């Protein structure tokens, strides 16, 4: 398992090296384009069942989400399934079982990676580490929390590289400042590091050292704020080498993905799908010969009755 300490060591070994151009993704005779489908959730908040009544009656629930995911996987060759945090808290399931059924459900659905939201500490940092260790068969990725000396120290990674159909996809993650938001007793001595600096450091490593064709950041910062508080909007604008930010925390249902320009004037896409598993985000990327990628299609799919 890659730890933040190992990442920093690897980064030090490569520091100062010349930037080399990325090799062409497609060799002669291969297909001219490839497709990657990214499915994503955020702020599900222990909503394992559909809403029983009210505005979202019949919507959400892990059974309906799993059905949609399986249908998309049957139709598409290269699919990633990601979550941007706040898996826990919000229903009696968490009050009674402290995250066990949520982790089991996500593992059964085949999530490729997730990050950590502030409410994932609501049972305490030891509980979070225990539930990940016992029930999650996918990695939790976060680059700006230093868990040294805490139970989470061996249960997270600063990045993950996934190969899909000849594409090399790098994934990192960032979390929100916990001080003032979460009781200190719940997160212990976890240190919060600058998310823009850490995400950029890891993204640079993934693009230059790991030769990733795309870098995705799972973010629990929140999409944007009225003041200058760090957000996904500012992360997109100030970072380098991140292509896509899966947003969370602010529970916003985006009508469509947002497009920003980063510090190098390259495009960064940001998307968020509300909360409670009411929607499943879908982003379809096409990679052309020469490693040119574009967001081809997007859809926020309503989960539940009639979905």
Annotate the PLM regions.
Residues 307:
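Polyanionic/metal-chelating signatures
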Residues 2-304:
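Acidic, metal/ion-coordinating pockets
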